[in-house]
Amino acid sequence: MPVQRRSYRYPEDYEDVGAFLVRTYAATAAGPHRNWLRPRWEYMHYHPAIYGRESEFERCGLWTDGNRIVAAVHFEHRMGVVYVQLDPMYASLKRDLLTYAIEHLSGEFKAGPAVHVYLDEDDAGFGVVAESLGFAKMSEEQAEVTTRLPASRVPEQVHVPDGFEVLGMDEDDDVAKVHRVIHRGFDHDGEPPEDELDDRRRKLSAPGLR
């Protein structure tokens, strides 16, 4: 059976796409095209920017081989800003994925309707396909940097200063505390805005959060 293309159905396909990302971790970790990690997929769905817009998910595309998802093309929070997830065994789909983005995921920008697709800079072949379809490389200022820490490099024990302790969200799920930590972690001064607490609570409601 040839690879089939269809719309992403939320919430029915949500877990299956997450499993697809996990399945392709090992195959894509070294590039040239690196897929999202599953936590970002969850964050995308539980971010307040998407609240009330869930019907727009049907514009995203999935490619399946039998019952297996082998590729996905989707926006995150802004229509027209697009990401590609691809099983490396199906590299021949690259042109189809980008064509789908052009036809279904265009957004409105200051210069008019457009599609911005983030591709891994190590995947020169994907870049060639994009250029053949009329895409132009964005400036370095518009690049998106992703940092990953291999599990093998995570220390078994974490030492913190006296008076501090490391707790999991299952031990202390005080949303206000987490909101304050993240606010300070992004180098903001003062206390976090209280009117953002519900938005933070929504983000923290993602089922895979630890």
Which role fits each region the language model picked out?
Residues 6-15, 21-108:
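Conserved donor-binding loop and adjoining core beta-sheet/short helix segment
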Residues 19, 23, 84, 103, ...:
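Charged/polar, solvent-exposed surface patches and flexible loops
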Residues 16, 38-40, 125, 195-199:
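Exposed alpha-helical structural elements
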Residues 18, 25-29, 39-45, 76, ...:
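Long, contiguous binding/interaction regions
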Residues 1-28, 136-137, 145-172:
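Conserved N-terminal entry element of GNAT/NAT acetyltransferase domains
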Residues 15, 127-128, 176:
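Alpha-helical elements of the RecA-like P-loop NTPase motor core of helicases
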Residues 69, 76-162, 170:
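Acyl-donor-binding surface of acyltransferase catalytic domains
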Residues 30, 155-210:
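Flexible, substrate/cofactor-facing loop regions flanked by secondary structure
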